[in-house]
């Protein structure tokens, strides 16, 4: 699923985020990606999806090199960023337009998840609250049913009941064939649903273990 060896990346020559990072991750698990601000969590997610390009080393995801950004690869991965600039359109139109890029997109599931989150498809994404927008985007991400789903701080901006809904839908509406990586500072929000954790510190993996081992 994911193979990383000797990965190097820096935003400038003097600011290296990763120096020789190595990582192996198999298929079909929910992993919590942990670490303080500035440790490289978001950078790693973007490298895995081809939004940033490694400077050296090996990186293989789903049998593809993300650096090549092949359509067949991009259709199988999705990164839900912490912050998303949304257009002034309805949730339904956003789902329709963006879901068309993913062959695995399940429109019926998307609408079912909106109901669970108490959202109407006709709501304008620009005019709803931050928490509502976050839930709409989570519903879209899960409805894509991609083999590799990455989420950057998905519970930020959610109230306690919404966090419970998030845990429930993640457990209920993901399959054993999917691999999900969730970057978070709030591990207590996810400890009941994640299978393993990976902890980054100063651009290095200091812990990779199952939840039972931690």
Residue map of PLM features:
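The feature captures the beta-strand-to-loop junction immediately N-terminal to the Walker
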Residues: 34-36
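Helix-to-loop junction immediately C-terminal to a conserved catalytic motif
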Residues: 49
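Conserved ABC transporter NBD signature motif
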Residues: 57-68, 72-73
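ABC-family P-loop ATPase nucleotide-binding domains
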Residues: 79-136
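Catalytic Walker B motif of ABC-type/P-loop ATPase nucleotide-binding domains
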Residues: 149-153
């Amino acid at each position: 699923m994911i193979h990383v060896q000797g990965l190097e990346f820096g935003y400038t020559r003097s600011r290296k985020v990763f120096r020789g990072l190595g990582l192996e991750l198999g298929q079909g698990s929910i992993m919590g990606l942990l670490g303080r601000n500035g440790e490289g969590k978001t950078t790693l997610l973007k490298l895995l999806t081809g939004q940033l390009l490694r400077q050296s080393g090996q990186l293989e995801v789903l049998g593809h090199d993300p650096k090549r950004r092949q359509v067949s690869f991009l259709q199988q991965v999705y990164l839900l960023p912490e912050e998303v600039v949304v257009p002034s359109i309805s949730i339904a139109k956003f789902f329709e337009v963006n879901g068309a890029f993913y062959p695995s997109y399940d429109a019926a599931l998307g609408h079912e998840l909106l109901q669970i989150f108490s959202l109407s498809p006709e709501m304008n994404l620009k005019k709803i609250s931050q928490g509502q927008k976050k839930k709409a985007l989570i519903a879209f991400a899960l409805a894509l049913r991609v083999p590799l789903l990455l989420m950057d701080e998905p519970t930020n901006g959610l109230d306690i009941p919404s966090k419970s809904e998030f845990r429930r839908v993640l457990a209920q509406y993901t399959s054993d064939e999917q691999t999900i990586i969730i970057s978070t500072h709030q591990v207590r929000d996810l400890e009941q649903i994640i299978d393993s954790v990976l902890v980054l510190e100063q651009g290095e993996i200091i812990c990779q273990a199952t939840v039972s081992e931690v």
